[in-house]
Amino acid sequence: MTVQRIFRLSSVLRSAVSVHLRRNIGVTAVAFNKELDPVQKLFLDKIREYKAKRLASGGPVDTGPEYQQEVDRELFKLKQMYGKGEMDKFPTFNFEDPKFEVLDKPQS
């Protein structure tokens, strides 16, 4: 009986979510079709151009050799500061269990 209630509740939730999503998709489609003013259009064009350059170069755009030297210098500082480990993965820790002395309880 509870399984039937769960299935009924899940179907009600699924239909409510689908109606909500349909409404939101309809509203966003109208919002994205509006015309942009010229300044917004230029701004978006520049962002898209920058993204294309960044993807083509595979890294930062419009940087010289000074930038790469600075990055290398900072990475060297980090390696010196944090133990010269691999910077791309999480470090592994080895914790040893503490050794306790067993003390005899004095009998009274």
UniProtKB/Swiss-Prot annotation:
Compartmental location: Mitochondrion; Mitochondrion inner membrane
GO cellular component terms given for this protein: cell surface; extracellular space; mitochondrial inner membrane; proton-transporting ATP synthase complex
InterPro entries registered for this protein in UniProt: ATP_synth_f6_mt, ATP_synth_f6_sf_mt
Modified sites of kind N6-succinyllysine: K84, K99
GO molecular function, one term: protein-containing complex binding
Spans traversing the lipid bilayer: none
A Pfam match: ATP-synt_F6
Residues modified to Phosphoserine: S108
Example GO BP: negative regulation of prostaglandin secretion
Keyword terms, alphabetized: Acetylation, CF(0), Hydrogen ion transport, Ion transport, Membrane, Mitochondrion, Mitochondrion inner membrane, Phosphoprotein, Transit peptide, Transport
Family, similarity comment: Belongs to the eukaryotic ATPase subunit F6 family.
Self-association state and partner proteins as the record states: Component of the ATP synthase complex composed at least of ATP5F1A/subunit alpha, ATP5F1B/subunit beta, ATP5MC1/subunit c (homooctomer), MT-ATP6/subunit a, MT-ATP8/subunit 8, ATP5ME/subunit e, ATP5MF/subunit f, ATP5MG/subunit g, ATP5MK/subunit k, ATP5MJ/subunit j, ATP5F1C/subunit gamma, ATP5F1D/subunit delta, ATP5F1E/subunit epsilon, ATP5PF/subunit F6, ATP5PB/subunit b, ATP5PD/subunit d, ATP5PO/subunit OSCP.
The name this protein goes by in its record: ATP synthase peripheral stalk subunit F6, mitochondrial
Protein species of origin: Rattus norvegicus
Lineage: Eukaryota, Metazoa, Chordata, Craniata, Vertebrata
